[in-house]
């Protein structure tokens, strides 16, 4: 990717889900405008942009955040002149929220990370990093790293959520968030 636009650190610093998306997409729009001022075609460079988001604790809010961000980015790029669908796509990576992990009962973080990861997948993330359950204490141990990997594998291969492109499409609750 030519440019990766990050909102992860914004959320880790205490922003809301809405602020994370607002600032990150605004940064992306600023990159697009700057590139266009230099004569670059958004249909060419737009498909090389990627984003990096945080998955936090409020499950449904996170799913809705990612879904809304995808629609908003398509609208932003379209308004900037993108006609190629690939240039309008929000390609993004998600990492589970490090600031949500607790040191007092680290194994409870397994559930937190699992729900955050599932929210990201249901929201349409293209790649995912799951934090180790003990990262509130130190660098993840080998066991914690393995649990984080297995969490992704269970979601991807055993839960069935990846069997359809958009399993929550049409959900009144998600759409109204």
Cite the ranges covered by each PLM segment.
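Catalytic alpha/beta active-site cores
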Residues: 1-56, 61, 80-83, 88-93, ...
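Short glycine/threonine-rich loop-to-helix capping motif typified by GTGT followed
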Residues: 14-22, 56-68, 96-110, 138-147, ...
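Peripheral terminal and linker regions in Fe-S/redox and tRNA-modifying enzymes
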Residues: 16-24, 36, 65-69, 78, ...
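Glycine-rich and small/hydrophobic secondary-structure elements
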Residues: 26-33, 106-125, 147-156
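Outer-membrane beta-barrel translocator/pore domains, especially the C-terminal barrels
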Residues: 76-78, 102
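Hydrophobic alpha-helical bundle architecture
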Residues: 79, 110-114, 137
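Active-site or pore-adjacent capping/gating segments
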Residues: 126-177
């Amino acid at each position: 990717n030519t440019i990766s636009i990050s909102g992860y650190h914004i959320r880790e610093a205490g922003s809301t889900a809405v602020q994370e998306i607002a600032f990150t997409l605004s940064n992306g729009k600023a990159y697009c405008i700057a590139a266009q001022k230099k004569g670059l075609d958004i249909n060419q460079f737009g498909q090389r942009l990627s984003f990096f988001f945080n998955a936090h604790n409020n499950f449904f809010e996170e799913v809705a955040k990612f879904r809304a961000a995808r629609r908003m980015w398509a609208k932003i790029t379209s308004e900037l002149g993108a006609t190629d669908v690939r240039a309008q796509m929000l390609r993004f990576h998600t990492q589970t929220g490090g600031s949500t992990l607790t040191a007092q009962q680290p194994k409870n973080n397994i559930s937190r990370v699992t729900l955050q990861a599932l929210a990201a997948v249901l929201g349409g993330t293209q790649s995912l990093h799951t934090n180790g359950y003990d990262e509130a204490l130190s660098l993840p141990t080998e066991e914690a790293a393995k649990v984080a990997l297995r969490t992704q594998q269970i979601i991807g291969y055993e839960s069935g959520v990846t069997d359809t492109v958009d399993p929550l499409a049409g959900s009144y609750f998600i759409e109204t968030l």
